[in-house]
């Protein structure tokens, strides 16, 4: 049985907290897309664990963890993150953590060219804005993957006597191509080659054929939780292109990023922040560049775990959520950070878009259209009381329940969990 946790907006919805809540019930936690370009924090017994690339199922000592073929891996960061987690007391990680042999490798030159490409794109764009990359080399790695010139984990750990020679040749070809494209840049390819050579033996114990790994687990009726990265509105196909990440962050990426058939997926949990945030550039129809936006930012402590960048803030956009549900097919929702709205007298919710007075029937794919949309809001009464100590759904203020019911009715998906505060256990469960 496979269940999936996916972000429904532009990321930073609080997926990690739900995974943290659920992980004790699962035998395996898997990641299917992205790299170390996203992050979340999990608190266990007062200890904070920061996750970027590694599956957060590592906090459960009885859980196996898989980094799937759809993930791109910067090997130095992999070991640094593992070392950091172990230094905080995480035990037996090495026997419970596995990497797909088909996952592509991120190199330092990918990270250098990521930043150069960002400058190039911002200089060529009409408004001078950039995509807002994290600079982790994710996009350039997926680019080499798509062009069939990338290097995968199995290329690095292959025991064939000629394997390292082939690896070196392909690696140097990749570097030369980028030097031809961008000229000379601060980078020592020979040093990185030797570093990766030293990683070969260290990495081998982690590497598995992930297709066999997953299908063997499914055959044995193991409970598997897939931990989504980023969110649907950052999906390379369905997000606000080009202000997106470079992988499929929706349900399709789970299937291709782990090599599992759709019929194995039972539940899809959509994680929804009670308002909306976005990091970096790109369309954001319900953004509030005013006192309300600042209030959401300050109360919600909206800063990125990976980049530290301030998040843009606005009201909940149900047009986005409904569109997200069309693609991902959520079986239930987790509304997070509802407590951030505790002090608002009135709360607005975006329910439709129009351009030049004409209502749009669906979420627009074109940024020129999206830039012109006028958002129609419904104003709901706030509850103006602290909900952080509430443990039962029925004890939530009446207006808080009405707010949640409005979301359920609009999207036509039941809400199963509600985040009521920053504490690990500040989550109300609702029977569905």
From Swiss-Prot:
Binds 1 Mg(2+) ion per subunit. It holds the Pfam family Adenylsucc_synt. It is an enzyme of class 6 (ligase). Its main location: cytoplasm. It catalyses: IMP + L-aspartate + GTP = N(6)-(1,2-dicarboxyethyl)-AMP + GDP + phosphate + 2 H(+). Pathway: Purine metabolism; AMP biosynthesis via de novo pathway; AMP from IMP: step 1/2. IMP binds at residues 12-15, 37-40, 134, 148, 230, 245, 309. PROSITE patterns: ADENYLOSUCCIN_SYN_1, ADENYLOSUCCIN_SYN_2. HAMAP family: Adenylosucc_synth. Plays an important role in the de novo pathway and in the salvage pathway of purine nucleotide biosynthesis. Catalyzes the first committed step in the biosynthesis of AMP from IMP. Belongs to the adenylosuccinate synthetase family. This is Adenylosuccinate synthetase. It comes from Kluyveromyces lactis (strain ATCC 8585 / CBS 2359 / DSM 70799 / NBRC 1267 / NRRL Y-1140 / WM37) (Yeast).
